């Protein structure tokens, strides 16, 4: 897969020549404007939204992930290591070269301003299921009722095999959780493809230690012992597992679950304090009210209406 670099006023970037935007400057302006989104996926520390990218090969629905660098820590990290968008771009291409799946990377955009945002754009996969919803159902014994079209045991086995291929290829994802795996099934419910997403923490290019492998595996929220056993057996095989590795895995796994529960409790408390002392603000994709708008019309733009 070839890569083409480009520069525009205020921006530099890379793209796939076969899917080059038909009007590069226009599409860059649209990609970087959340108001052009067809759908918002996540609005938090990072922004994720769907746009329709007009390319030389026709329109392509794409997911845009915006990484901000407003704080000093983020700017220093970007200067020393590059942006998280660039990291996602490099890892995505390396995964595909290694025969692993991730939504096709389409565009990398870097603001020339040190404090400006960076954007990673990839193809939107359709007909896929975010594994987090399947695992949530399984953890309460409802996977068959909620997802009758998915062969859950075969999914766990393929998930373990995919994780093994990932690690053997020298990738340490560092956030291998159910929210970062997309599943596509065959007509009979068997897993046809597993896509990895959220790649900006990934380290690559070296052999993983057993400890690093177990730390990655432990982040998958499998609460039923039989599900964990099936997953680990598919990862290690019959000969490589063993009680010591399982014990270390369980210590990491329970530690990860405890950490997540603690974070949720802490966030609940800090959110209450934040709401008391900081005013609510509108999402960034809602523009300012036009100067000529009447008082009645301005209600539409009021931050409390969002």
Regions found by a protein language model. Name each.
Residues 2-9, 258-297:
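Membrane-proximal basic amphipathic "stem/tether" segments
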Residues 3-23, 31-34:
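Cationic, histidine-enriched alpha-helical/coil surfaces that engage anionic ligands
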Residues 23-132, 164-169, 173, 268, ...:
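Conserved ATP-binding subdomain of kinase catalytic cores across diverse folds
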Residues 55, 185-188:
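Short acidic-glycine loop/turn motifs at beta-strand connectors
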Residues 130-146:
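AlphaC helix of the protein kinase catalytic domain
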Residues 176-186:
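Hydrophobic residue at the +6 position relative to the catalytic HRD Asp in the kinase catalytic loop
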Residues 192-272:
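C-lobe/activation-segment region of protein kinase-like
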